[in-house]
Amino acid sequence: MTLVMVLANNDQAIILADRRTSQQREIMLPDGRTSLARHPVDEEYNKLTSFVCADARVGVGFTGVATTPTGFNTAKWLLTALMEAARPSPYLQPTVERLREIATRDIGALPGEHRLTVVLAGYLHSDAPPLGCLYWISNFEGLGAKRYGPVRPAFESYVITQDRPSPEPFYLMQVYGSIGALKNRASQEDGAAVRHLLAQRRPAHAIRDKALAALSRAGAPSGGLGGIGRQCGSIVVPSEPSEPITTGYLSDENRWQVEFPNQVVMVGADTDGATMGTYFRAEDPTEAPPLAVRKVPRNHACPCGSGIKYKRCHGRVLPPIRS
């Protein structure tokens, strides 16, 4: 199960997710007993989408069922579900409520029992200045990280919005899905560091990169057992509507193809629609440097093999990729 992380303050909302899908299978222990463990199926399955509607911009992520043996694909379903939900009225609040109804209808119709949480984090622009908001719909996760035992037949919707007026600075951190991967001392220290960056309103790339590093540290290497992996994606939604939504990708290995989050625009115009599967690719990996590499200390040699220090090669802070 995916780990989805939401980080927001007055400046931006950041949503992160690892890209692994996995299956629970039986393994043999050294003492001859058997146990169940999560085996990776796909290390590069995108679970993030940017969503723009008439009154809001949000990043969207999901955790839970990704695919089924019958051919259901949650990433594809989410695009069509968001468009169906927003079509009658392209505003965030009614869209989320209709998305809850669609999820109850469609996920409930799948054979078997399937957990799913869909998270939407960003800003409502009907307020001035824009209002930070976090919505999620789920059939197994509630408020305060509460989890229900059996999967519920109907999805529930939840919302957290920025308090106004408030003397306290606004920031929030929330995680969904494989939260057990963060129940260790290193992850708790990482969480405290990220919380400090949020409260101090540090640049978006500093907050995102620290959180991505923490998520990667908690994940298993490619092919290793575990519910989450080290290949991760990110969406950054600025609170200022004139600033572009940006996307990112963190890899634990050299990659010559990089896929970016999906996009849905539903503002009540003829141009409404969705895109999926956008990627950059080197046509000939034998002739081109990798597009993404494992992050290393700034003064170490870059893993791409260029012989240049990481900070002057793939570790340079470049202009963001715009969504």
Segments (PLM) and residue ranges:
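N-terminal nucleophile
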Residues: M1-A288
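Acidic/negatively charged segments and metal-coordination signatures
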Residues: M276-S323
